[in-house]
């Protein structure tokens, strides 16, 4: 008796599968629209090994005297923007700008940590130090995003002939990226 019930159940199950097979089922289709918006974004920071421009030692008596040479230095920032996004990187005037300093033509100075003496310096976009780096869209560095962090070089010069006392001179310049 159990064998008959099992056989009937098996036949019923098989018949139900045949009755609802995909060959006999109706279908309907619709499109699913899928979208995403990728916004332009940028970040700027000191990055690995960046964020500092150290000029080293300034020698106002011999090497960097009025008859000597300027002191050069190089630093870097880490910049990342969305692929193919355009941006402009600007550098502020620093904490101790000289009289007459403007956003377009910054007259930057480092201050002696132990006094109120200043050591003037300039920042440039190019290794030849011909294009001054300012804090306006016209004096900033154009940048095209690659989607990856990119080191951006900052070139500096401390002009020769500055008669200053010994000590450690510092300044902080705000780097801004506008995108």
UniProtKB/Swiss-Prot annotation:
Pfam family, one: SCPU
Signal peptide as annotated in the record: 1-25
Keywords (A to Z) from UniProt: Secreted, Signal, Sporulation
Cited InterPro entries: Spore_coat_component, Spore_coat_U/FanG
GO BP, sorted A to Z: sporulation resulting in formation of a cellular spore
Record flagged with keyword Secreted: yes
Location(s), subcellular: Secreted; Spore, Perispore
A single GO cellular-component term on record: extracellular region
Primary site of residence: secreted
Alphabetical list of PANTHER family matching this protein: PROTEIN U-RELATED
Purpose of the protein: A late-developmental spore coat protein.
The name this protein goes by in its record: Protein U
Species this protein is from: Myxococcus xanthus
Gene: pru
